[in-house]
Amino acid sequence: MLGLKPIKLLPARERVASALRKAIISKSIPEGAELTLENTAQELGVSVTPVREAFQILARDGLLEVKQNKCAIVLGVTEKTIREHYQLRAALEGTACMLCCQNNADLSKIKNCVDTAEEALSHQQTGNYTDYNQSFHFEIWEASGNEKMRNLLSELWNGLSIGVEMSELDYALNSQSEHKKIYAALEARDAMASRAEMEKHILRSMDDALTYYL
């Protein structure tokens, strides 16, 4: 036994928003597509309530236009939209890392995420890496102690940003390597280094997402 703890997941509305945001950014759901509450809920295996809440989150992001008849229309996504999204995430998550260091936060849950992912990837098991990745970021937001920042970052979450020419395993290994650098800086209580490593990590994800548009 490795003594690892369960991975924590985001609330349902953020998971739904993440799945939809990723599909819209990667163009799996095209501009102009109509999404209904019932069909989206059925496809994602959730109730209608978190889908309705996710529609509102994505409407605030400018990705959906919510209609009165329980549906939403996918709006166009541009390079500018993607850059602004990731630049905001980089700024907020970099600050979250700094707060972890400045507050001398307990890093045990963050370490658990790194160790669990490392064990899985050592056997080339990538099936659950989406959850490991999500939990790593979530635990940093939690450890920052800033509840408003955590809530905003939860709504901004969009999961893995795998580029068009990258395999799932290569992406996971690259992401995990970056996570280990972030954790090492957090463990050293180096606020500036942890912020820099996190910003680099998020902006690399931005570059991967932009491969669908450039």
Describe the role of every protein-language-model region.
Residues 60, 64-65, 158, 172-173:
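Mobile beta-alpha loop/short-helix "lid" or hinge segments that flank ligand
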Residues 160-168, 206-213:
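Short amphipathic alpha-helical interaction/hinge segments
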Residues 11, 107-108, 170-174:
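Short helix-capping and inter-helix turn/linker motifs at the boundaries of alpha-helical repeat units
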Residues 65-67, 133, 174-176:
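Short, flexible turn/loop "capping" segments at secondary-structure junctions
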Residues 85, 102-165, 177-184, 193-203:
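Conserved amphipathic alpha-helical segments that form helical-bundle/coiled-coil interaction surfaces
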